Curated annotation (Swiss-Prot):
Residues with Phosphotyrosine modification: Y105, Y453
Region (Necessary for interaction with GRB2): 498-550
Organism this protein belongs to: Mus musculus
Protein name per the record: GRB2-associated and regulator of MAPK protein
Gene Ontology molecular function terms on file: proline-rich region binding
Keywords: Mitogen, Phosphoprotein
Sites bearing Phosphoserine, chain numbering: S609, S613
Function (record text): Acts as an adapter protein that plays a role in intracellular signaling cascades triggered either by the cell surface activated epidermal growth factor receptor and/or cytoplasmic protein tyrosine kinases. Promotes activation of the MAPK/ERK signaling pathway. Plays a role in the regulation of cell proliferation.
Top-level lineage group: Eukaryota
Domain SAM: 811-876
Amino acid sequence: MDPAPSLGCSLKDVKWSPVAMPLDLLVSTYRLPQIARLDSGECVEGLRENDFLLIHSCRQWTTITAHSLEEGHYVIGPKIEIPVHYAGQFKLLEQDRDIKEPVQYFNSVEEVAKAFPERVYVMEEITFNVKVASGECNEDTEVYNITLCTGDELTLMGQAEILYAKTFKEKSRLNTIFKKIGKLNSISKLGKGKMPCLICMNHRTNESISLPFQCKGRFSTRSPLELQMQEGEHTIRNIVEKTRLPVNVTVPSPPPRNPYDLHFIREGHRYKFVNIQTKTVVVCCVLRNNKILPMHFPLHLTVPKFSLPEHQVKGDMWPETLVHHWLGICQEQFDIDEYSRAVRDVKTDWNEDCKSPKKGRCSGHNHLPNSLSYARDELTQSFHRLSVCVYGNNLHGNSEVNLHGCRDLGGEWAPFPHDILPYQDSGDSGSDYLFPEANEESAGIPGKTEVPYEELWLEEGKPSRQPLTRSLSEKSRCDTLRGSTRSTCAPSSPPTPATLGATIKSSEIALPPPPVPPKSEAVREECRLLNAPPVPPRSAKPLSTSPSIPPRTVKPVRPQTRSPSPTLSYYSSGLHNIITQSDTSPPNSAPVSCYPCTRVKSDSVDPKSPFGSPSAEALSSRLSWPNHYSGASENQTRSDFLLDPSRSYSYPRQKTPGTPKRTCPAPFDFEGCELLGSPPSTTSAEFSSSGVPSCPKSASYCLENSEDNSFAAGMTKQSVSCPALPPRAPKPVEQKATPETSPLPLKIDGAEEDPTAGSLDLSEDQYFVRKGMQDIFSVSYPFSSPLHLQLAPRSCGDGSPWQPPADLSGLSIEEVSKSLRFIGLSEDVIAFFVTEKIDGNLLVQLTEEILSEDFKLSKLQVKKILQFINGWRPKI
């Protein structure tokens, strides 16, 4: 069956390239189909030396692994693979779990909590609203809306109590001011109570939820879809979409026959569907005398090497004609779709040790959990828990994928090493579903130790670790894709010293990691915080990529960080401070970072680099957070960073310029100014520590810092309050080497302690923020008016000297309390202002009517406050 004489020669006369390449590299480099010859010395079952092959296409196969069953549910015989598009039908049998755990039905959350099964399913749509209080000392409330859809799978995690609020409002003139500035009515009377609730994981939304016991609705330990499936006959695709594997089935009627079947499914046989798996295969046709033999090579296994025609390697067009000739012959004798739908035995050399996406390093062929361990080890080890096709019929079983044109980040072709395979995604019938595939290591490759998920995305550019499979966001880097299919390639093997620089540079591109699969520890942490995302671990300390940067010797004390929670109010969470693209950008004199600074020391700057950069360890110890700013380009400004709508909620909010109390010194100059060029300044500060008013919103820390003493005497301090957040990787700035500096003494507002003065040299962007037992901190910012500093010091009542500024609108709640104490008001009045959360912006809008009638103050107290607002200060 040689080609026609017009082609000029037969396959035996073709001059083959002396360089052979592995099949995975071949299909990623050249368009398919291609004619190839098995390299001499390669030993492949079913192939002879120097066999000619037509490499037809790459296919992504989705199959269900099944066992044959005897009476009594005993598993016998080898495993088989049934394609998801298998045309035969099956009938569900009584399941093992039905015997061990009979189906239960519930009519309320309280009934579910009493029985506390492992999981329940929602049998009808449920909507429930509850008003949640932020805390014992906080009168903010938030309406907690709960919506459950029919079929939602809920894994029970535990029980807790939430504070619910019963509010009956009073008419108050203060309400007008609160509404005017967008705040809730805090004058309303608030009654609180504790409500027991059931904490569950909703696998449709991938979120933990708190269901109050009062919530009514029908629940069951079996999915409503699965209960409907008990009757009738169903395709295998329908079964795996609507039931939870493993599941026992029988063959009720004679199944269709496929000429390529290697295992024959017969009427009356019983099977246990164990799990679902997806693998990428290269389908080929062996070209022999008057015979076409189809075969396939799974890319997760070791693949053979092939040689291409020399003309093809050189880019000539002649081999194209030869390829199309043989392709036409193959299509006459070979149906690739039928071949892809064949039932086959599972090969014994397939390693099933990998059951978690974190284990192993190849993803070409993947397994979901084994049948005998389907009881929950992790929340990730269930077909439905990984957002499979229950919620959108997205199974693909015979889709063609195109690996051609994929390059790695460095611009080189990315071959598939035999122990690193691409994470494939294929869109069949418009599907965007990517199977949650666990990894399997190739035969003969020793298993690698498990790597924490966060580290997978932190150390891609490090020479000490093998580059890992790309994130899904890199799919756009593939040059050409066929149809609606998509694919990703693994990065090439570890970089050599000559190419290390380029590799590290490419790794600095801020690519977000894919979403973290829900793990039991993370979910329990979520539930503990009532639907708050789990705080990423602080312990991830990546090694430095530059050996010339020594490790940091002094570490600042990092403040504790509290995750935003639905029980926090709209204002206390900081959400109201997010600005939009239309907002005015802040002036250069008001940096917007509120991080506890991580200082860049003189010995941490690479002298060869035009920019001083901190060491890797000196950067954030929480780089597992999606820090888009790390490694950003030099022309990116802080406004670009803060205004990007894709940023995580956990970054600081930027206050509008009308309320400058939210600004504070940034640890780095994002405008690129030389901060260290000026002479070092000498600054004195006082340490003090004491109690704060009951239930404060934050502990106010005042940082004394100025260019010189005379300038410091003429500047006012203004405190800002914002949630304590982890230090981020800063934009590199030009810096000059400075002598080793010591931590800057702090003055803690409202505290009593023996003051200690110290003199030290530092620049404006080098300081440590010390953290006590508070979750919120404030850093003083030099205010525009120096008038109040001309007044003599006076005690605030707690021992710390402080004078109010001339402009009161920017004061924090704590500073308003100090101001009232400064003018001699009683502690009960001050406590009332704290309870009502009166800050400077509210203080200047108070009227005599509000103070006397709503605040119930005496005439003298009202007069003092109004005169104080108008500029009066008591003389000492």
